[in-house]
């Protein structure tokens, strides 16, 4: 008998010929419904590249327009969940309250996109942050899901930037460092991050990858 990964309730499932060889349920019906309710509405009017929700008076995505003036844009963002409600609370508990075992829940919820790429590359945290929480939040989820990845990027230590404006963050030094002997020339990269907000972090990482002559990069985020 298993417990729900989200609420801990006991899961009862009758074994029949129809479900004998299926993977066991890991969420109770109530939690499955709650998580389904915060999935991105793919029918809503969104930017085709970054999935930002667009108002009726927005003819194009201002975020992508801003980024395109400074970076070669990612080809596509893939994401299944809104960064809101249950997901926002869970990521806060996982990253900032250091609840490591929530990586199992995240690994169960997310689905790596079925798209072409040569390397899956997690977006790193600063060494100080990983040392403080004792794990890297993105890598832990990928490991829990059994996904092979390559640690091509490193991040230098820097102060948290949530209080800075977009322009102030842009003026700051790029914190990413390429740390690999892999030949990235002409390769397609899938960057993986926990949250996609303004896109600056992702595109700064992409900037370093383009300097190594990658062909293009796509992004998968746990929440947007």
Roles of regions detected by a PLM:
Residues 1-224:
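Glycine-rich phosphate/pyrophosphate-handling loop used in enzymes and phosphotransfer proteins
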């Amino acid at each position: 008998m298993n417990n729900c990964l989200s609420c801990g309730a006991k899961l009862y499932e009758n074994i029949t010929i129809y479900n004998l060889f299926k993977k066991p349920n890991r969420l109770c019906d109530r939690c499955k419904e709650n998580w389904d309710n915060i999935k991105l509405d793919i029918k809503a009017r969104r930017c085709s590249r970054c999935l930002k929700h667009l108002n009726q008076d927005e003819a194009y995505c201002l975020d992508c327009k801003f980024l395109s003036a400074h970076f070669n844009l990612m080809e596509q963002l893939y994401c299944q969940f809104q960064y809101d409600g249950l997901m926002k609370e869970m990521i806060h508990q996982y990253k900032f309250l250091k609840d490591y075992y929530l990586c199992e829940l995240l690994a169960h919820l997310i689905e790596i996109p079925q798209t072409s790429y040569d390397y899956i590359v997690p977006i790193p945290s600063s060494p100080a942050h990983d040392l403080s929480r004792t794990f890297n939040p993105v890598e832990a989820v990928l490991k829990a899901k059994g996904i092979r990845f390559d640690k091509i990027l490193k991040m230098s230590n820097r102060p948290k930037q949530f209080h800075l404006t977009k322009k102030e963050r842009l003026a700051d030094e790029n914190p990413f460092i390429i740390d690999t002997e892999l030949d990235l020339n002409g390769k397609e990269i899938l960057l993986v991050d926990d949250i996609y907000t303004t896109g600056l972090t992702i595109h700064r990482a992409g900037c370093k990858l383009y300097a190594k002559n990658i062909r293009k990069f796509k992004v998968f985020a746990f929440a947007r």
